[in-house]
């Protein structure tokens, strides 16, 4: 939540007590001294003593009803008390005294804007500007009115004029930061927030908005410091605590987030945003009963709040009540939620209604073009449907989407965009999982062909494997591990941005033949000899990284595969690593599965094992990518709604010519997949074609 907040235009010195004493001395000598009464009223207003402020302003009016500033002051303090009608009358009286009074027009503009009437406010602000062309506050007011109507570019022009007229006014920088963020110029917005803070170090709203933008950029340490400063300066501001809680929750610091939310709840227990944040915190720790309870509290207090309705849809989606979720998201859209269309697109996607999902995501981007998450969801749908030209471009939004990159890497050198390298050194680095590194390292040779030297930085488990890449063996690239300091480089590019740079389409996926290979290694020779009755040696993997949020859909329990292990003529080898490998001990006594990966040090060892097999059968894991990259026949078992890279309703994939895809016919139904694989394994023709080594 980033906020545009303004403070009173009155310039009140910081030492209010001393100022009040000075005015009081004047009033002791002359209780009807107008200037002192006006000054005391403004001091009381700045000190949040509203009753005293009104009393002093009325005394000033009584002393000098013919002087416009007394009525303007009365209007200002009445507006601060929420007495809108009386404030309007006071400003109108000031104009009756002097129709050319710019301050009275300014006051009416502020009044109209506070009433939610920005167009009416513009009329008064412009009149004020005509009376006093150098009035910075009038430009600020015009900017506020335009910003409230989402006319941010026009608002920025007026904020800049205000800044030229009053370069030391912190509010000008603050307001420029606000609209620049809305226009997508995040770095410029951050710079202006910092300037506002430099001019006024206690500017709590600037600290808060700075923290929000830094969080969106993944600069979490600096964001936390800014938000902590904001809540220190303004401890009763619920929005500051909410933003800090959101940051902590995204860092999975749940106990701290809960502690901060308690502070927000203590301040405003009826605040729907606080209640929704409590609901989201329960969802993050998978406490669905608690989440539903907080949602009900939110609904009781704000039943027509668009984000409350949107959150209801999120909970329904989380429980896989997809049709209900899509309907709830549609209601949230009608109420004005900017994120609900993207959420509806996700529900439609999970129901297999791809074209409707695409339309919803396109609509979401139109409504909220600056949202990284919205554009990222559109990208995944486009890639899934084969629209790679647009999909790769939109996929770049992942760097601004914290769910994908909570702490993105920052380099001092430029990002490579595909230009000739001319002998420069370029860092290509893995950014997501092991399988992604294996899938996209094929592009390293294409980058080197642009005339530079490639430094390939990958996860430790695949570092040794990458030495088998032809571009590394030729000396045109070297390999280093993530977390290590790489050799000096001139340019950088993440591996998963390379398909966009090279304009990859479904028809032009680079496949130079198998591009990863096993080194000569004792592992390959340690496999048991093929049994007399076994014609096929098959490797199996059934589970991925359990930390991946969609792992419950792509992974299975080992016992699900038991029917395959009873097929005669097949010798089975486990390629499974991680916690799921412990399931080997629970196999029935009549089933035997060699633990081929138990002693693997890394994926180079796994590659040596795969090289000795005839076939690999796996769920969507790094093993699928490794076998495919080696040119080994691989059967990939996929959930009903698989990852975008396997596209939709295809038995094959352009990424790996030797891969066959076995997709669930209905969500969660692995039994049909087992039946199809068993049929293929027991068909003599199918089994026989696996035995010869593949040639490319």
Feature-to-residue mapping (PLM):
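Alpha-helical solenoid repeat scaffolds of the TPR/TPR-like class and their adjacent stem/linker regions
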Residues: 1-615, 620-696
């Amino acid at each position: 939540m980033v906020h545009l907040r303004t403070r009173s235009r009155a310039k009140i010195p910081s030492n209010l007590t001393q100022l009040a004493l000075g005015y009081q001395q004047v009033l002791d000598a002359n209780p009807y001294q107008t200037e002192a009464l006006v000054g005391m009223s403004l001091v009381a207003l700045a000190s949040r003593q509203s009753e005293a402020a009104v009393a002093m302003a009325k005394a000033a009016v009584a002393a000098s009803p013919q002087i416009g500033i007394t009525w303007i002051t009365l209007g200002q303090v009445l507006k601060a008390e929420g007495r809108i009608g009386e404030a309007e009358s006071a400003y109108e009286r000031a104009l009756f005294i002097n129709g050319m009074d710019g301050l009275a027009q300014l006051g009416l503009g502020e009044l109209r804007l506070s009433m939610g009437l920005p167009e009416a406010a513009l009329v008064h602000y412009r009149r004020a500007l005509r009376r006093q062309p150098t009035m910075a506050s009038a430009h600020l007011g015009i900017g506020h009115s335009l910003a409230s109507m989402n006319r941010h570019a026009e608002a920025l022009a007026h904020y800049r004029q205000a800044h030229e007229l009053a370069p030391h006014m912190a509010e000008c920088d603050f307001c420029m930061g606000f609209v620049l963020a809305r226009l997508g110029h995040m770095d410029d917005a951050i710079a202006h927030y910092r300037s506002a803070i430099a001019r006024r170090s206690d500017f709590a709203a600037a600290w808060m908005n700075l923290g929000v933008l830094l969080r969106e950029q993944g600069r979490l340490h600096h964001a936390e410091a800014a938000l902590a400063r904001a809540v220190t300066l303004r401890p009763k501001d619920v929005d500051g605590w909410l933003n800090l809680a959101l940051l902590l929750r995204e860092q999975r610091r749940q106990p701290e987030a809960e502690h901060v939310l308690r502070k927000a709840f203590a301040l405003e227990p009826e605040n729907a945003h606080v209640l929704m944040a409590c609901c989201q915190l329960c969802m993050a720790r998978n406490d669905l009963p608690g989440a539903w309870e907080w949602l009900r509290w939110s609904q009781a207090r704000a039943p027509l709040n668009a984000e409350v309705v949107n959150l209801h849809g999120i909970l329904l989606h989380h429980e896989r009540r997809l049709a209900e979720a899509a309907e709830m998201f549609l209601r949230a859209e009608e109420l004005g939620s900017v994120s609900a269309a993207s959420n509806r697109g996700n529900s439609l996607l999970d129901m297999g209604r791809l074209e409707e999902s695409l339309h919803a995501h396109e609509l979401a981007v139109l409504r909220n073009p600056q949202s990284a998450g919205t554009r990222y969801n559109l990208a995944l749908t486009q890639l899934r449907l084969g629209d790679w030209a647009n999909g790769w471009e939109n996929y770049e939004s992942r760097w601004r989407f914290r769910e994908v990159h909570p702490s993105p890497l920052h380099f001092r050198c430029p990002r490579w965009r595909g230009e000739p390298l001319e002998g420069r050194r370029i860092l290509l680095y893995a950014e997501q999982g092991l399988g992604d590194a294996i899938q996209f390292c094929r592009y390293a040779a294409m980058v080197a062909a642009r005339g530079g030297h490639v430094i390939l930085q990958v996860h430790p488990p695949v570092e040794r494997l990458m030495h088998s890449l032809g571009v590394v063996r030729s000396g045109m690239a070297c390999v280093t591990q993530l977390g290590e300091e790489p050799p000096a480089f001139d340019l950088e590019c993440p591996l998963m941005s390379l398909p966009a740079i090279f304009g990859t389409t479904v028809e032009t996926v680079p496949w130079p033949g198998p591009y990863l290979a096993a080194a000569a290694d004792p592992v390959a020779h340690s496999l048991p000899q093929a049994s007399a009755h076994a014609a096929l040696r098959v490797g199996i993997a059934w589970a991925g990284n359990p930390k991946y949020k969609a792992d419950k859909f792509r992974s299975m329990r080992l016992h699900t595969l038991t029917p395959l292990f009873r097929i005669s003529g097949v010798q089975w080898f486990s390629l499974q690593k991680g916690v799921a490998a412990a399931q080997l001990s629970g196999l029935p006594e009549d089933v035997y599965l060699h633990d081929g990966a138990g002693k693997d040090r890394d994926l180079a060892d796994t590659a040596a094992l795969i090289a000795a097999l005839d076939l690999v059968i796996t769920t969507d894991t790094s093993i699928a990518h490794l076998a495919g990259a080696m040119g080994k026949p691989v059967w990939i078992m996929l959930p009903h709604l698989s990852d975008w890279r396997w596209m939709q309703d295809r038995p094959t994939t352009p990424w790996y010519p030797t891969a066959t895809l076995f997709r669930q016919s209905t969500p969660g139904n692995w039994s049909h997949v087992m039946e199809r694989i068993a049929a293929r394994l027991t068909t003599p023709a199918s089994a026989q074609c696996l035995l010869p080594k593949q040639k490319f």
